[in-house]
Structures are given as structure tokens and as C-alpha cells.
Amino acid sequence: MNVLPCSINTLKGLYEISGVEVGQHFYWQIGGFQVHAQVLITSWVVIAILLGSAAIAVRNPQTIPTDGQNFFEYVLEFIRDLSKTQIGEEYGPWVPFIGTMFLFIFVSNWSGALLPWKIIQLPHGELAAPTNDINTTVALALPTSVAYFYAGLTKKGLGYFGKYIQPTPILLPINILEDFTKPLSLSFRLFGNILADELVVVVLVSLVPSVVPIPVMFLGLFTSSIQALIFATLAAAYIGESMEGHH
């Protein structure tokens, strides 16, 4: 019987399939480390845009704001209102953190639709929005997790951990699991939405390359803005929750 050779061949086939990587990636070898070059390149571009915008905003401030200064002041006021609504009266120290998260994600998401990443050729893979990669979204979610633990411990000391046995100690495992799943939900929600948006646009452009994809691209810009707002709102809400101790 050829059962054993067939089984071995089947296992080999499954192993080869499991080794297939979805998409290609371009890496830099720095010392003994592999660095994901695609994410770094696009992230540096986004950071450069943000730093350039900040430099323009503070270059020549006027007592009576001009159009450009009005815009940047509106953005700052929006972030302050968002932080105050979710965190409460002690929101002040957290405005830079929430603002950085919101602006980086917002510009990253929009860069995927507005910047012509595809014209830059790489040896492997292609450039896309930084938030199109799970490494970026996890890297954004983990500091958020650290931030709300830090906020709670700073405000309440070791008494912060008392929330895990409220309203009853029976809920201890669930309360612990809830805190450690927050960064997972933040990262996968952002990654999934941005990846799906870019894939839909790519498929439509390949099928109908003229007019039809344009409304979808505008819809993508809108949903990208909403995703940045959701991430920043949840980050601020988690920080406020850890400081106030309510659910």
C-alpha cells in the first residue's frame, strides 16, 4: 500500500502551504536584527509631515490668528476637548499623548490614499500606509496600555489593583483579561479597517480603473478619519477609566 508515502507527501504539502507568507516584505539587516524597512520608511515620511506642519504652525504666531494658525489652533482645541471629555479635569498632562496618537494615525491613514506610494519600487514588496501593517498598530496599542496602567498607579498607588476584585472577587480573571485584551482590540481594529480599505480600492482600480474607485477613495478617507478618532477616543477613555475607577 502507498498510504505512508501519500501521507508524507500530504504533510509536506501542508508544511509548504503553512510557510507561504501573505504579501512580501522588504527588510534591512542591521547587525543581528531584521528591520521592517517598509514600515520605517513610510513612518518617517508621516513623522516628517507632522514635524513640518508643527514647524509651520509655530514659526510666526500672531495675536490675531491667520488662516493657517486658525486651522492648527482648531486641531489643538479639538484634541483638548476630546481629552477633557474622556479623561476629566485632570486631562492636561495627557493632551500631548492623545494628540500624538490621533495625529500620527490620522496622517498615516490618509497617506495610504493620497500619497503615491506605489511609484516607489522596492526589491521586495511595496510601500503602503504605516497603519496597514500590524507591527505599527501593535506598537501604537502597547504604549496606550502602559499609559492607562501608569495613570491608574500614579493616581491611586497599589490601590489601583483593587478594581480587579470589584464588584466581586469572582470576576478577577475576567477583569484581568479585559485589561490585557484592550491593546489587542485597538491594534486589530485599526489594522483590519485600514488594510481592508486599501485592498478594496486596489481591487476596484484593477477592475474599473477610471471613475468608480473615486467615491470609494473618498469613503476611505472618511473611514480613515473615523478610525483615528476611535483609537484616540478609546485611549483617552481607558486612561480616564483607570484614574476614576469606574466601568
UniProtKB/Swiss-Prot annotation:
Regions crossing the membrane: 38-58, 95-115, 134-154, 199-219, 220-240
Cross-referenced SUPFAM superfamilies: F1F0 ATP synthase subunit A (SSF81336)
Matches recorded under Gene3D superfamilies: ATP synthase, F0 complex, subunit A (1.20.120.220)
Topology relative to the membrane: Multi-pass membrane protein
InterPro entries listed in its UniProt record: ATP_syn_F0_a_bact/chloroplast, ATP_synth_F0_asu, ATP_synth_F0_asu_AS, F0_ATP_A_sf
Protein's cellular compartments: Plastid, Chloroplast thylakoid membrane
Domain of life: Eukaryota
Function: Key component of the proton channel; it plays a direct role in the translocation of protons across the membrane.
Subunit structure: F-type ATPases have 2 components, CF(1) - the catalytic core - and CF(0) - the membrane proton channel. CF(1) has five subunits: alpha(3), beta(3), gamma(1), delta(1), epsilon(1). CF(0) has four main subunits: a, b, b' and c.
Family listed: Belongs to the ATPase A chain family.
Name of this chain's protein: ATP synthase subunit a, chloroplastic
Lineage: Eukaryota, Viridiplantae, Streptophyta, Embryophyta, Tracheophyta
Gene encoding the protein: atpI
